[in-house]
């Protein structure tokens, strides 16, 4: 009897264990299927980002160096700083004219101011900037200030940089450029600007009046920081296309001094039949057509003026655009003719 009872209990335990194993296998299979489904759903959902994430990725894409943003009126320099593409030049402006012109340029929304030690008006530029800041028109960070080191200062570039900072009344200068090619000592002057970048005194550095590709390359090969900008005489009759193509390989952008042709020469361009015809079609002035051409062609423009009305006119070039045909007709005006001999 005891043997029968023991056999019965043993069989019962065997059947119970078998049942548990079957249930465990079933649950494991169910969990595996569920995990597989979740994995598939996850893979399918990862094929496409949500719209918000896609937009976020789009908005964080880096801005391409040297490409003009005509909507915001800026260009990203190879130094990593954004620069306005239209501004005010101050060549030949007296102290009072300069201060008034810079103030009105800032008042009208301009944020690029160009001066130079040799112009003798850096202090006036500084006063106008401080006035605009004090009146809440803009902040220092919103203004892009360019000045230039004159050739006689190349022997002691470090002192020249400090002197410009003091005259401008600024803690840093957005862009300093060598005013002219001078092979005897421009490399040393440029190296002084490189040191000033490392010290936080300058943010970007560049060149002016280098018209020969070999001359530009000479300085680049002897220095460390590639010029962010080359400022040359550039206008519709002297478009500097070959030089611009050459410096583009370095990520260097072209800036035009005398973008309207220069004092004593502007009327020649203003009266050009092609320019007049396009101006009439857009109900704009010849100056506005020329400046718009510069921006669409990839030239930063710094027209000078002591007349607040003209300053406002020069800045008001973002409410229209030139067609491809109009750009081609204007580009065809190139005569490779310089009006100044610097």
Annotated model-derived regions:
Residues 25-61:
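Low-complexity, Pro/Thr/Ser/Glu-rich flexible segments characteristic
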Residues 16-19:
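C-terminal motif of bacterial Sec signal peptides marking the signal peptidase cleavage site
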Residues 181-342:
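Beta/alpha (TIM)-barrel catalytic core signal, keyed to glycine-rich beta->alpha loops juxtaposed to Asp/Glu
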Residues 158-179, 195-199:
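CE4/NodB-like, metal-dependent polysaccharide N-deacetylase domain
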Residues 94-106, 153-167, 216-217:
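Short, acidic/polar
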